[in-house]
Amino acid sequence: MDSSNYFHDCKTMLSEHNESIESSNNDINGKQKEHIKKGNSENQDVDPDTNPDAVPDDDDDDDDNSNDESEYESSQMDSEKNKGSIKNSKNVVIYADGVYDMLHLGHMKQLEQAKKLFENTTLIVGVTSDNETKLFKGQVVQTLEERTETLKHIRWVDEIISPCPWVVTPEFLEKYKIDYVAHDDIPYANNQKKKKKKKSKGKSFSFDEENEDIYAWLKRAGKFKATQRTEGVSTTDLIVRILKNYEDYIERSLQRGIHPNELNIGVTKAQSIKMKKNLIRWGEKVTDELTKVTLTDKPLGTDFDQGVENLQVKFKELFKIWKNASNKLITDFTRKLEATSYLTSIQNIIDYEIENDDYASSNFDDETSS
Protein backbone atom coordinates (compact mmCIF):
# COMPACT_ATOMS: atom_id res chain seq x y z
CA MET A 1 0.00 0.00 0.00
CA ASP A 2 1.37 3.43 -0.89
CA SER A 3 1.51 6.22 1.69
CA SER A 4 -1.41 8.20 0.22
CA ASN A 5 -3.73 5.22 0.44
CA TYR A 6 -2.55 4.51 3.95
CA PHE A 7 -3.28 8.03 5.21
CA HIS A 8 -6.62 8.00 3.47
CA ASP A 9 -7.34 4.65 5.08
CA CYS A 10 -6.43 6.07 8.52
CA LYS A 11 -8.70 9.05 7.95
CA THR A 12 -11.56 6.73 7.04
CA MET A 13 -11.02 4.59 10.11
CA LEU A 14 -10.94 7.61 12.40
CA SER A 15 -14.21 8.79 10.93
CA GLU A 16 -15.74 5.37 11.47
CA HIS A 17 -14.40 5.35 15.01
CA ASN A 18 -16.09 8.68 15.81
CA GLU A 19 -19.38 7.48 14.37
CA SER A 20 -19.22 4.31 16.44
CA ILE A 21 -19.25 6.23 19.77
CA GLU A 22 -23.01 6.00 19.93
CA SER A 23 -22.98 2.24 19.17
CA SER A 24 -22.30 -0.62 21.56
CA ASN A 25 -18.95 -1.31 23.23
CA ASN A 26 -18.40 -4.41 21.10
CA ASP A 27 -18.56 -2.33 17.91
CA ILE A 28 -16.10 0.15 19.37
CA ASN A 29 -13.66 -2.65 20.29
CA GLY A 30 -14.03 -4.11 16.81
CA LYS A 31 -13.16 -0.80 15.20
CA GLN A 32 -10.11 -0.45 17.45
CA LYS A 33 -8.86 -3.95 16.50
CA GLU A 34 -9.39 -3.15 12.84
CA HIS A 35 -7.37 0.04 13.24
CA ILE A 36 -4.49 -1.90 14.84
CA LYS A 37 -4.58 -4.55 12.08
CA LYS A 38 -4.31 -1.97 9.34
CA GLY A 39 -1.52 -0.21 11.15
CA ASN A 40 0.56 -3.42 11.24
CA SER A 41 0.03 -4.10 7.50
CA GLU A 42 1.55 -0.80 6.37
CA ASN A 43 4.11 -2.44 3.99
CA GLN A 44 1.79 -5.19 2.63
CA ASP A 45 -0.07 -5.11 -0.71
CA VAL A 46 -3.83 -4.91 -0.38
CA ASP A 47 -6.24 -6.39 -2.94
CA PRO A 48 -9.35 -4.26 -3.07
CA ASP A 49 -11.38 -7.08 -4.57
CA THR A 50 -10.67 -9.67 -1.86
CA ASN A 51 -9.93 -7.63 1.25
CA PRO A 52 -13.01 -6.03 2.84
CA ASP A 53 -10.74 -3.59 4.64
CA ALA A 54 -9.29 -2.23 1.44
CA VAL A 55 -9.32 1.43 0.52
CA PRO A 56 -12.75 2.67 -0.68
CA ASP A 57 -13.25 3.45 -4.32
CA ASP A 58 -13.12 6.96 -5.76
CA ASP A 59 -16.90 7.41 -5.55
CA ASP A 60 -16.87 6.96 -1.77
CA ASP A 61 -13.97 9.40 -1.52
CA ASP A 62 -15.96 11.99 -3.41
CA ASP A 63 -18.88 11.50 -1.04
CA ASP A 64 -16.61 12.05 1.97
CA ASN A 65 -15.20 15.22 0.43
CA SER A 66 -18.69 16.55 -0.24
CA ASN A 67 -19.68 15.83 3.37
CA ASP A 68 -16.60 17.69 4.63
CA GLU A 69 -17.43 20.67 2.44
CA SER A 70 -21.04 20.79 3.67
CA GLU A 71 -19.88 20.62 7.30
CA TYR A 72 -17.43 23.48 6.69
CA GLU A 73 -20.14 25.59 5.09
CA SER A 74 -22.43 24.89 8.05
CA SER A 75 -19.75 25.95 10.55
CA GLN A 76 -19.12 29.11 8.56
CA MET A 77 -22.82 29.96 8.72
CA ASP A 78 -22.85 29.42 12.50
CA SER A 79 -19.81 31.67 12.87
CA GLU A 80 -21.51 34.43 10.90
CA LYS A 81 -24.57 34.12 13.15
CA ASN A 82 -22.40 34.48 16.25
CA LYS A 83 -20.78 37.58 14.82
CA GLY A 84 -24.20 39.04 14.22
CA SER A 85 -25.27 38.36 17.80
CA ILE A 86 -22.11 40.05 19.11
CA LYS A 87 -22.92 43.13 17.06
CA ASN A 88 -26.46 43.15 18.41
CA SER A 89 -25.18 42.96 22.01
CA LYS A 90 -22.82 45.92 21.62
CA ASN A 91 -21.31 47.19 24.85
CA VAL A 92 -23.20 50.24 26.14
CA VAL A 93 -21.41 52.75 28.38
CA ILE A 94 -23.66 54.14 31.14
CA TYR A 95 -22.62 57.04 33.37
CA ALA A 96 -24.12 57.70 36.81
CA ASP A 97 -22.93 60.59 38.97
CA GLY A 98 -23.67 61.70 42.50
CA VAL A 99 -22.31 62.60 45.92
CA TYR A 100 -22.69 59.07 47.35
CA ASP A 101 -22.23 60.30 50.91
CA MET A 102 -22.91 57.68 53.59
CA LEU A 103 -23.59 55.05 50.91
CA HIS A 104 -26.93 53.36 51.58
CA LEU A 105 -29.47 50.98 50.05
CA GLY A 106 -30.94 53.68 47.79
CA HIS A 107 -27.55 54.28 46.17
CA MET A 108 -26.98 50.56 45.63
CA LYS A 109 -30.37 50.03 43.99
CA GLN A 110 -29.81 53.01 41.71
CA LEU A 111 -26.44 51.63 40.58
CA GLU A 112 -27.97 48.19 40.03
CA GLN A 113 -30.70 49.70 37.83
CA ALA A 114 -28.11 51.58 35.79
CA LYS A 115 -25.99 48.46 35.33
CA LYS A 116 -28.97 46.41 34.14
CA LEU A 117 -30.33 48.95 31.64
CA PHE A 118 -28.76 46.91 28.81
CA GLU A 119 -27.57 43.34 28.42
CA ASN A 120 -23.93 44.32 27.97
CA THR A 121 -23.20 47.42 30.05
CA THR A 122 -20.13 49.19 31.36
CA LEU A 123 -21.10 51.37 34.31
CA ILE A 124 -18.95 54.43 35.01
CA VAL A 125 -19.69 56.20 38.30
CA GLY A 126 -18.74 59.82 38.94
CA VAL A 127 -18.13 61.12 42.47
CA THR A 128 -18.41 64.87 43.05
CA SER A 129 -15.66 66.77 44.86
CA ASP A 130 -15.90 67.99 48.44
CA ASN A 131 -15.70 71.68 47.50
CA GLU A 132 -18.37 71.60 44.77
CA THR A 133 -20.68 69.51 46.94
CA LYS A 134 -20.41 72.02 49.79
CA LEU A 135 -20.93 74.90 47.35
CA PHE A 136 -23.94 73.54 45.45
CA LYS A 137 -25.58 71.11 47.88
CA GLY A 138 -24.25 71.28 51.43
CA GLN A 139 -21.90 69.80 53.97
CA VAL A 140 -20.74 66.20 53.49
CA VAL A 141 -20.06 63.63 56.19
CA GLN A 142 -17.42 61.62 54.31
CA THR A 143 -14.45 62.91 52.36
CA LEU A 144 -14.02 62.34 48.62
CA GLU A 145 -11.47 59.60 49.30
CA GLU A 146 -13.83 57.78 51.67
CA ARG A 147 -16.78 58.01 49.27
CA THR A 148 -14.66 56.77 46.37
CA GLU A 149 -13.20 53.86 48.31
CA THR A 150 -16.68 52.74 49.37
CA LEU A 151 -17.88 52.65 45.75
CA LYS A 152 -14.96 50.41 44.77
CA HIS A 153 -16.59 47.61 46.75
CA ILE A 154 -19.95 47.77 44.93
CA ARG A 155 -20.33 44.89 42.45
CA TRP A 156 -22.23 46.94 39.84
CA VAL A 157 -19.48 49.56 39.43
CA ASP A 158 -16.95 49.02 36.62
CA GLU A 159 -15.08 52.34 36.61
CA ILE A 160 -14.97 55.44 38.84
CA ILE A 161 -14.25 59.07 37.93
CA SER A 162 -13.22 60.92 41.09
CA PRO A 163 -13.72 63.82 41.23
CA CYS A 164 -16.24 64.29 38.46
CA PRO A 165 -17.68 67.56 37.09
CA TRP A 166 -20.85 68.81 38.73
CA VAL A 167 -22.51 69.34 35.33
CA VAL A 168 -22.21 66.82 32.49
CA THR A 169 -21.16 68.39 29.18
CA PRO A 170 -21.02 67.05 25.60
CA GLU A 171 -17.22 67.14 25.80
CA PHE A 172 -17.35 64.93 28.86
CA LEU A 173 -19.57 62.38 27.11
CA GLU A 174 -17.27 62.30 24.10
CA LYS A 175 -14.11 61.98 26.19
CA TYR A 176 -15.31 58.87 28.02
CA LYS A 177 -17.37 57.45 25.11
CA ILE A 178 -20.54 57.60 27.22
CA ASP A 179 -23.77 56.50 25.54
CA TYR A 180 -26.29 57.38 28.26
CA VAL A 181 -26.46 59.14 31.63
CA ALA A 182 -28.52 57.41 34.33
CA HIS A 183 -30.20 59.39 37.10
CA ASP A 184 -33.62 59.68 38.69
CA ASP A 185 -36.09 61.73 36.67
CA ILE A 186 -36.66 64.39 39.34
CA PRO A 187 -35.41 67.81 38.06
CA TYR A 188 -32.04 68.51 39.64
CA ALA A 189 -31.37 72.24 39.85
CA ASN A 190 -27.99 73.83 40.40
CA ASN A 191 -27.85 76.27 43.30
CA GLN A 192 -25.78 78.97 41.59
CA LYS A 193 -27.59 82.27 41.02
CA LYS A 194 -26.23 83.26 37.63
CA LYS A 195 -26.90 81.69 34.27
CA LYS A 196 -23.99 79.98 32.59
CA LYS A 197 -23.55 79.14 28.95
CA LYS A 198 -21.16 76.41 27.84
CA LYS A 199 -20.02 75.90 24.26
CA SER A 200 -19.28 72.64 22.49
CA LYS A 201 -17.83 72.49 18.98
CA GLY A 202 -19.54 75.62 17.75
CA LYS A 203 -22.81 74.75 19.48
CA SER A 204 -23.95 75.97 22.84
CA PHE A 205 -26.27 74.69 25.51
CA SER A 206 -27.40 76.60 28.55
CA PHE A 207 -29.27 75.92 31.71
CA ASP A 208 -30.73 78.17 34.34
CA GLU A 209 -29.04 76.75 37.42
CA GLU A 210 -31.72 78.14 39.68
CA ASN A 211 -34.81 76.94 37.81
CA GLU A 212 -33.88 74.35 35.18
CA ASP A 213 -32.86 70.72 35.45
CA ILE A 214 -29.13 70.29 34.78
CA TYR A 215 -29.97 67.02 33.00
CA ALA A 216 -32.53 68.71 30.72
CA TRP A 217 -30.27 68.89 27.67
CA LEU A 218 -29.45 65.19 28.02
CA LYS A 219 -33.16 64.36 28.06
CA ARG A 220 -33.74 66.45 24.95
CA ALA A 221 -30.82 64.75 23.21
CA GLY A 222 -32.06 61.25 24.06
CA LYS A 223 -28.98 60.58 26.20
CA PHE A 224 -30.80 60.19 29.52
CA LYS A 225 -32.05 57.01 31.19
CA ALA A 226 -34.27 57.43 34.26
CA THR A 227 -33.82 55.30 37.36
CA GLN A 228 -36.27 54.93 40.24
CA ARG A 229 -35.56 56.35 43.69
CA THR A 230 -36.00 54.20 46.79
CA GLU A 231 -38.63 55.96 48.87
CA GLY A 232 -37.77 56.76 52.48
CA VAL A 233 -34.06 56.11 52.05
CA SER A 234 -31.61 58.95 51.55
CA THR A 235 -28.55 60.46 53.19
CA THR A 236 -30.71 63.34 54.45
CA ASP A 237 -33.15 60.90 56.06
CA LEU A 238 -30.30 59.13 57.85
CA ILE A 239 -28.93 62.42 59.19
CA VAL A 240 -32.41 63.47 60.38
CA ARG A 241 -32.73 60.20 62.28
CA ILE A 242 -29.44 60.93 64.03
CA LEU A 243 -30.41 64.52 64.85
CA LYS A 244 -33.70 63.39 66.38
CA ASN A 245 -31.68 61.49 68.98
CA TYR A 246 -28.79 63.95 69.07
CA GLU A 247 -28.49 64.11 72.86
CA ASP A 248 -28.64 60.33 73.18
CA TYR A 249 -25.67 59.99 70.83
CA ILE A 250 -23.81 62.75 72.71
CA GLU A 251 -24.36 61.09 76.08
CA ARG A 252 -23.32 57.70 74.75
CA SER A 253 -20.16 59.17 73.26
CA LEU A 254 -19.32 60.93 76.54
CA GLN A 255 -19.81 57.67 78.43
CA ARG A 256 -17.34 56.02 76.06
CA GLY A 257 -14.70 58.55 77.04
CA ILE A 258 -14.89 60.92 74.07
CA HIS A 259 -13.95 64.47 75.05
CA PRO A 260 -16.61 67.17 74.50
CA ASN A 261 -14.23 69.09 72.22
CA GLU A 262 -14.22 66.15 69.81
CA LEU A 263 -18.01 66.38 69.70
CA ASN A 264 -17.81 70.10 68.95
CA ILE A 265 -19.48 71.03 72.24
CA GLY A 266 -18.24 72.69 75.41
CA VAL A 267 -17.89 71.18 78.86
CA THR A 268 -20.92 73.12 80.10
CA LYS A 269 -23.07 71.77 77.26
CA ALA A 270 -21.89 68.24 77.98
CA GLN A 271 -22.77 68.53 81.68
CA SER A 272 -26.16 69.99 80.79
CA ILE A 273 -26.94 67.04 78.50
CA LYS A 274 -25.91 64.56 81.18
CA MET A 275 -28.13 66.23 83.79
CA LYS A 276 -31.05 66.39 81.39
CA LYS A 277 -30.80 62.72 80.51
CA ASN A 278 -30.54 61.78 84.20
CA LEU A 279 -33.68 63.79 84.98
CA ILE A 280 -35.53 62.13 82.13
CA ARG A 281 -34.56 58.69 83.35
CA TRP A 282 -35.52 59.62 86.91
CA GLY A 283 -38.88 60.94 85.74
CA GLU A 284 -39.53 57.70 83.91
CA LYS A 285 -38.76 55.72 87.06
CA VAL A 286 -41.07 57.93 89.17
CA THR A 287 -43.84 57.49 86.63
CA ASP A 288 -43.39 53.74 86.75
CA GLU A 289 -43.54 53.78 90.57
CA LEU A 290 -46.71 55.89 90.59
CA THR A 291 -48.27 53.57 88.05
CA LYS A 292 -47.47 50.58 90.21
CA VAL A 293 -48.98 52.28 93.30
CA THR A 294 -52.18 53.51 91.64
CA LEU A 295 -52.83 50.30 89.73
CA THR A 296 -52.38 47.98 92.70
CA ASP A 297 -55.29 45.71 93.57
CA LYS A 298 -54.50 45.89 97.29
CA PRO A 299 -56.43 48.31 99.54
CA LEU A 300 -54.72 51.57 100.31
CA GLY A 301 -52.79 51.42 103.54
CA THR A 302 -49.37 50.14 104.40
CA ASP A 303 -48.39 49.50 100.80
CA PHE A 304 -49.54 52.98 99.81
CA ASP A 305 -47.58 54.57 102.64
CA GLN A 306 -44.54 52.57 101.60
CA GLY A 307 -44.98 53.86 98.08
CA VAL A 308 -45.11 57.45 99.34
CA GLU A 309 -41.95 56.87 101.37
CA ASN A 310 -40.24 55.50 98.29
CA LEU A 311 -41.22 58.63 96.41
CA GLN A 312 -39.81 60.78 99.21
CA VAL A 313 -36.55 58.85 99.04
CA LYS A 314 -36.49 59.33 95.28
CA PHE A 315 -37.04 63.07 95.67
CA LYS A 316 -34.21 63.26 98.22
CA GLU A 317 -31.94 61.36 95.84
CA LEU A 318 -32.91 63.72 93.04
CA PHE A 319 -32.17 66.76 95.20
CA LYS A 320 -28.80 65.30 96.16
CA ILE A 321 -27.93 64.58 92.54
CA TRP A 322 -29.07 68.04 91.51
CA LYS A 323 -27.09 69.70 94.30
CA ASN A 324 -23.90 67.78 93.53
CA ALA A 325 -24.24 68.42 89.81
CA SER A 326 -24.89 72.12 90.41
CA ASN A 327 -21.90 72.43 92.73
CA LYS A 328 -19.70 70.64 90.23
CA LEU A 329 -20.97 72.79 87.40
CA ILE A 330 -20.32 75.99 89.36
CA THR A 331 -16.89 74.80 90.47
CA ASP A 332 -15.90 73.84 86.92
CA PHE A 333 -17.18 77.14 85.64
CA THR A 334 -15.25 79.20 88.22
CA ARG A 335 -12.10 77.20 87.60
CA LYS A 336 -12.48 77.65 83.89
CA LEU A 337 -12.65 81.43 84.32
CA GLU A 338 -9.93 81.35 86.99
CA ALA A 339 -12.12 83.54 89.16
CA THR A 340 -11.69 81.83 92.52
CA SER A 341 -8.99 84.23 93.73
CA TYR A 342 -10.99 87.19 92.45
CA LEU A 343 -14.07 86.11 94.41
CA THR A 344 -11.92 85.58 97.53
CA SER A 345 -10.46 89.08 97.33
CA ILE A 346 -13.95 90.55 96.93
CA GLN A 347 -15.10 88.65 100.01
CA ASN A 348 -12.11 89.95 101.99
CA ILE A 349 -12.91 93.54 101.00
CA ILE A 350 -16.53 93.10 102.02
CA ASP A 351 -15.49 91.67 105.39
CA TYR A 352 -13.05 94.54 105.93
CA GLU A 353 -15.70 97.15 105.13
CA ILE A 354 -18.14 95.51 107.54
CA GLU A 355 -15.56 95.55 110.32
CA ASN A 356 -14.86 99.25 109.74
CA ASP A 357 -18.55 100.05 109.77
CA ASP A 358 -18.98 98.23 113.06
CA TYR A 359 -16.01 100.07 114.58
CA ALA A 360 -17.27 103.48 113.41
CA SER A 361 -20.75 102.74 114.66
CA SER A 362 -19.48 101.79 118.12
CA ASN A 363 -17.41 104.99 118.36
CA PHE A 364 -20.39 107.07 117.31
CA ASP A 365 -22.54 105.47 120.00
CA ASP A 366 -19.89 106.18 122.68
CA GLU A 367 -19.61 109.82 121.69
CA THR A 368 -23.37 110.40 121.71
CA SER A 369 -23.78 108.71 125.08
CA SER A 370 -21.09 110.87 126.67
Curated annotation (Swiss-Prot):
| Stored Gene3D superfamilies | HUPs
Q: Where is the composition biased (Acidic residues)?
A: 44-72
Enzyme Commission numbers on file: 2.7.7.15
Q: SUPFAM superfamilies in the record, alphabetically?
A: Nucleotidylyl transferase
Q: Where is this region: Disordered?
A: 17-85
Q: Where does CTP bind?
A: 99-107, 137, 183-184, 188, 229-233
Q: Which UniProt keywords apply?
A: Lipid biosynthesis, Lipid metabolism, Nucleotidyltransferase, Phospholipid biosynthesis, Phospholipid metabolism, Transferase
| Highest rank taxon of the organism | Eukaryota
The text of the family note is:
Belongs to the cytidylyltransferase family.
Q: What does this protein do?
A: Controls phosphatidylcholine synthesis.
Descriptive protein name: Choline-phosphate cytidylyltransferase
Q: Which organism is it from?
A: Plasmodium falciparum (isolate K1 / Thailand)
The upper taxonomy is: Eukaryota, Sar, Alveolata, Apicomplexa, Aconoidasida
